[in-house]
Each structure stands twice: as structure tokens, then as C-alpha cells.
Amino acid sequence: MSSPTTPVPVISWTADEAIKFLKEWNFSLGIIVLFITIILQFGYTSRSMFVYVIKMVILWLMWPLTIILTIFNCVYALNNVYLGFSIVFTIVAIIMWVVYFVNSIRLFIRTGSWWSFNPETNNLMCIDMKGRMYVRPIIEDYHTLTATIIRGHLYIQGIKLGTGYSLSDLPAYVTVAKVTHLCTYKRGFLDRIGDTSGFAVYVKSKVGNYRLPSTHKGSGMDTALLRNNI
């Protein structure tokens, strides 16, 4: 004789239970949403790198959280229509998550920087300053880049990179790495303001399927040569 099948419990919420849940957790949810909103609103590399990193962590967690929720919807679908939509959303979320990882790995191979896994952008600005390679994310595909020296402090596109530099340390070329290619920006203008300040403007001059040099001992010109095709 076969043992009787245990019925699967049906989980459902009444309107009163939902209202009770919101009343109990409303304050905590409000604080969490406010915190996320502030981080997303003010998380820029030109303002605070610490806040920007927190913003990237939040964005990075969005995809796995979305996949978990869509799978949960598939398991506890209300009807076949909801099940169909949940399956489609799950497949789309997984595909986009895989594409993100593939593109990030390709960009990491090109630059060797962990900023390649930035979920916000696939544009990484690379500048070689006296043998030290700085890599930072930028949102847009700019036609020009501006490097500024203010009393020894180096800024490029408003992002602070380091200290102890002068105008003579600025390289002849700056690069922006993308998933499929590398853009080279040539220094077209340099102006000195006072003894320890000034700025330089770099103009996009070449695009190719290259990677950054594996060594950091070269100058800015060496970086611009873009050896080691991939």
C-alpha cells in the first residue's frame, strides 16, 4: 500500500496580515530605502570614493537578488500565467548576469583592474603617472579628457587620483579601456596656472583592439603604444 501523500501547504496573505506587516516593519523599511536612495543619489567618484564603492556593492547585489526573487516566484506562482512570466524573467535575469560577468572578465583581461567588475559602466580610464597606473571608472564616452594639477594634487575628469605631481609628470597619452576596444587620447593642450597648478586636455585620437601593457615601468608614451593584442 502506498503511503498517503502529504498535501503541500498553501501560503497566502490576507489584506489585514499585509497591513500588519507594513505597520511592524514600516520604520525599518523606510530607513533602508532612505539609505539606499542617498547612496544612489550621491555616490560619485568625484565626491566620495567610499560612498561610491558602497553604491557599487548595492548595484552588484541587485542581480542575484532579482534572480532569487524570480525563482521564488516560479516556485510559488499563483497560476500558470504568473508562472510563465516568472520563468521568462528568471531566464532574462540569468542571461544578463552571465553577460555582465563575461564582459567584466574580458575587461579585466584588458586592464588587470578590479574596477572591471563595476556594474555601472564598462569605461575604465587609465593614466600612467611616473610608472604608476591609475585606473578609474567613468560613466560616459568622452571625446576629450581633462587632467588638472592643483598644488600637486592630480585630478582627471574631477576624480582625485593622487598627490605629489607636477605638470611635467602628465603623460603624452591617456587611454580608456572598453570591453571590445581601447581608446587612446593624445594630449592636445597644456596650460600652467601659477607655479604648482595647471591643466591638460586630451583628445581622442585612436581606437583599437588592444590591452594595456603588463608592465608599469614604462612612460605614458609606452602605454600609448598598446602592445599585446587580444
Swiss-Prot record:
Q: How the protein sits in the membrane?
A: Multi-pass membrane protein
The record's subcellular locations are:
Virion membrane; Host Golgi apparatus membrane
Q: Name one Pfam family in it.
A: CoV_M
Name the domain of life this protein comes from: Viruses
Q: Which GO terms describe its molecular function?
A: structural constituent of virion
Virion surface-side stretches of the chain, per the record, are 1-24, 77-84
Signal sequence extent: none
**Keywords tagged on the record:** Glycoprotein, Host Golgi apparatus, Host membrane, Host-virus interaction, Membrane, Transmembrane, Transmembrane helix, Viral envelope protein, Viral immunoevasion, Viral matrix protein, Virion
Transmembrane residue ranges: 25-45, 56-76, 85-105
**GO cellular-component term (any):** viral envelope
* Subunit organization: Homomultimer. Interacts with envelope E protein in the budding compartment of the host cell, which is located between endoplasmic reticulum and the Golgi complex. Forms a complex with HE and S proteins. Interacts with nucleocapsid N protein. This interaction probably participates in RNA packaging into the virus.
Name the protein family. Belongs to the betacoronaviruses M protein family.
Protein name per Swiss-Prot or TrEMBL: Membrane protein
| Annotated organism of origin | Porcine hemagglutinating encephalomyelitis virus (strain 67N) (HEV-67N)
Question: Taxonomic classification, please?
Answer: Viruses, Riboviria, Orthornavirae, Pisuviricota, Pisoniviricetes
